[in-house]
């Protein structure tokens, strides 16, 4: 996204919308994960849109919080008040989910606030209006975000452990 300094990730999705056809995966660029997470997401039950979630004891202001109802996602956002999980920023779309997502992304970018929205705000909108967003837990598997320079040492160790596990397998 050449406009990353002026926009949020919804605009990046808009730029890539021509590639978002058929079945596809969408991953936040700052998310690191062990291979088993991708395997679990791909093997999840069929759904228009599937969001990977993790659960933990407490959540901070920067977490992308999620409210679930069984396997259904009811709400997602950093400021929602009721939540029971967090999104790790890794999603799977089927062809109909992809079409719905890109249509709403296009509509959102036509609004004044669209340039500053997260793409997960579109997922929240879809969950509220269409009830086609499901969740797949990756609880117990390792993942991390690369948000701050302080994250680098831990993330290097984590990635090295994944490589060692793969090489040793």
Segments (PLM) and residue ranges:
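Conserved N-terminal catalytic core of the sugar/cofactor nucleotidyltransferase
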Residues: 1-24, 111, 167
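Active-site phosphate/pyrophosphate- and oxyanion-stabilizing loops and adjacent acidic/basic residues
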Residues: 14, 39, 124
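ER/Golgi luminal nucleotide-sugar-dependent glycosyltransferases, focusing on the catalytic module
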Residues: 20, 42, 71-74, 78, ...
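Short beta-strand-to-loop acidic/aromatic patch adjacent to the donor-nucleotide binding site
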Residues: 22-32
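Conserved core of the sugar-phosphate nucleotidyltransferase
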Residues: 34-113
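Conserved alpha/beta core of the MobA/IspD/sugar-nucleotide pyrophosphorylase nucleotidyltransferase superfamily
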Residues: 86-169
